[in-house]
Structures are given as structure tokens and as C-alpha cells.
Amino acid sequence: MVKGWLFAFLKRQTAARKTDVELDKWACHCAFETGFGRCLDNRQVTKIRRKMEVKKPLILVSNDDGYHAKGLRSLVAMLTDFADVVVCAPDAGRSGFAGAFSVAKPLLLKRRKDVAGAPVWSSNGTPVDCVKLAFSELFAERQPDLILSGINHGDNAAVNVHYSGTMGVVIEGCLKGFPSVGFSLADPDEDADFEPLRPYVRDIVRRVLAEGLPKEVCLNVNFPRAQTFKGVKVCRMNRGTWVNECEKRTHPHGYDYFWMAGHFQSEEPEAQDTDHWALKNGYVAIVPTRIDVTCYDSLQRMKAWEKEM
């Protein structure tokens, strides 16, 4: 009987051998060289070959800019040479939907044209709806190894993580127990250049696939608008808020209406350990983000309320 460790040995040694003939010959050769002393019969070779087959990791890609967005298509093209990719994304832009999901309308799921060889589906729902639909309808036989969101047209640094549909995908994936990463570029242009991000995206994806992420932790990755980057900063979320958010206008018919506008105002512009600082100074910002939002510092202090109320 072939021992389990032989399967691992064969798997490592045959990673570059792709044809059936090569695999069969190598299986027999390894059986002899590792002390089994004879070639295996066809049934045993088939058993070993099945163990040797290395499946590509399966990655779900979504976003909040829509399945047609250049950022999503660029991300898929960065992955398909080493991963099986499935896309399920909104049929139009759904920026700012955060963790929203649909309860008052039926959802549609439509097959679209492949991107870089990856199958693409779109939905009329939110980014989170797309994740839920993908798990309900697209992964019946095999679960994804990783969930990715982006690449977003515009950054999602600092408090934007709470509003972001891009990170809504990531948080939903994390809630389901899957390693999840969001990618964003600080360039809202629909024709933004995503090529400088390629080596960093691929490296981060490979690291997460190999090492995993802690339970209930996902990653928020933001890139500055640049052709080259100074490096990577693993940092914390910047504190701040949006100001002057509502732009008031008057309709020709005489009533007022509003556009959401404004800008982000940092509460700690000089702090050098934040994503906001990293982006302003030309670094890729990686923020490990927790799902558990409990404030443990306050938990014990407020325990007294249990007796006082």
C-alpha cells in the first residue's frame, strides 16, 4: 500500500509535469526510487495521479463599481494564471452600499461574457447580495478559497471602510469564515491605470492563500495614485470624519435638493502609523480589519451598569 507521505512527495516532485504520460512515468519511477521496488499497476498509478493533481485555488471576485469596471477586470487578469476565478458583481455601480442587502425586491442573476477566461455573473442587487448569491447558486460543488473585492476606483482608507461597498463584500466574506481582501486605488477615474498594482496584488493574494488570515480578520488594502510605490505599510485606520457633506441646490421648479459631497478631515494628520499617512506619502497601506467591533476597554468599566440599572 502506498503511504500517505509518498503522495506528498509525488505532489511536490511532479508540479511541473503536466501530461498524463509524464505523470504516469514519474509515479512509477518515484515508487521504485522510494523503496517500493516495483512499478505500480494502472489502478495504483491512477490512485496516485488523483492525489497528485493540484487544483488551482478558487477565488470569488466582486466589487461595488459593477462587473464592467476596469478595476475588476484588471484584478481578474492578475489572477487567472494561478487561480480559478469566478466573478459575481453588481450590474451597475453600487458605491457606498456598505453591508446593505436587498429585502424588498427580487434579485436577478445574469451570465455575462467571460473576463480573461473567468466566468462572470451580474446581479441587480448590492455588493453583499452578490456574495450571498454566489454562495447560494455558484459554489454548490466547491467553496472558494479566497474572496476578493475591487479593485475599487477610489480609496477606501480611514472611516471609508464603514461606508464602502468594496469592503462590504470583504466583511461579508469574512463573516462567512473565508479569507477576504479588498483592494482600492486612490484614483476615481474610470480609466485609471491599475498595472502598477499587479506585483503587489499578486503577492498579497499568494501570501493570504498560503498563510490564511486570523479568524474574523480581513484586509483593507489601499494604493496611492502613482506609477511606483515606496513600499508597503501595515498600519491602522486613520481617525477622522467627513465634513461639508451635503451640497444644497435649488431646482428650477423652486424646491431644494441635495448632493452628497464633502471631504475627509483627519483628526490625526501627523500620525505616521495610519493608512491615510501611508497613502499621502506614497506607500501601499494594508489594514488588518476586525469583524468584532466590541470595545473591550469599555466592557469591564461598564459592567457596573448591570448592578446600577
Protein language model features and the residues they cover:
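Conserved acidic residues
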Residues: 145-146
